Amino acid sequence: MKQLEDKIREEGRALSDQVLKVDAFLNHQVDPVLMQAIGKEFAERFKDAQIDRIVTLESSGIAPAMMTALEMDIPFVFARKRKSLTLQDDLVEADVYSFTKQETNRISLSRRFVLPGERVLVIDDFLANGEAALGLTQLVEAAGAEVSGVGIVIEKSFQLGRDKLIERGYRVESLARVAKLEKDHISFVEVVR
């Protein structure tokens, strides 16, 4: 998605050869116009998948998931990284390691909001080693639903996340695929659509 790649070039920063900072428009401050375009792009890419619901992970996945759900006219639900007093009963759970935060979270989702037999689109902000996306697919399947696809806003293609998802049979659509991170330069995988 050219608009997203341009935004990453303009406002993203490679903090190392592994870490891309996009807090100016995605995971701290959010650009609503860009999120709207992202929602439209995901809706277009998955228009034939008959999606019933979107599942994402708090917090950076919420904006792109909500805009996609709005565009597709379907509900979305986000998995929580920590249990609260109101999120206690009938949960599906998975452990997810965050490379960026260097910690493991036990993510959870209420079975009330992902129903058996539903076709679910998993959306996440980043794909690196695939931990978050795989954790979300585990939640969806534990609830008895089917993962119809995985939508990623920014993929670090030099890491193994895509391969792990594809090996498990998931369709992966990434809007921007980063090939390499270097100081003052971010390069992208050229994708022919």
UniProtKB/Swiss-Prot annotation:
GO cellular component: cytoplasm
BP-aspect Gene Ontology terms: purine ribonucleoside salvage; xanthine metabolic process; XMP salvage
Alphabetic keyword roster: Cytoplasm, Glycosyltransferase, Purine salvage, Transferase
Primary localization: cytoplasm
EC number of the protein: 2.4.2.22
Coiled-coil ranges from the UniProt annotation: none
Gene Ontology MF terms: xanthine phosphoribosyltransferase activity
Main EC class the enzyme belongs to: transferase
Catalytic activities: XMP + diphosphate = xanthine + 5-phospho-alpha-D-ribose 1-diphosphate
Residues that coordinate or bind 5-phospho-alpha-D-ribose 1-diphosphate: 128-132
Biological pathway: Purine metabolism; XMP biosynthesis via salvage pathway; XMP from xanthine: step 1/1
InterPro entries reported in the protein's UniProt record: PRibTrfase_dom, PRTase-like, Pur/Pyrimidine_PRTase, Xanthine_PRibTrfase
Compartment(s): Cytoplasm
A Pfam family that the UniProt record links to this protein: Pribosyltran
Residue numbers binding xanthine: 20, 27, 156
Highest taxon above the source species: Bacteria
Family the entry assigns: Belongs to the purine/pyrimidine phosphoribosyltransferase family. Xpt subfamily.
Function summary: Converts the preformed base xanthine, a product of nucleic acid breakdown, to xanthosine 5'-monophosphate (XMP), so it can be reused for RNA or DNA synthesis.
Known partners and oligomeric status: Homodimer.
Protein name: Xanthine phosphoribosyltransferase
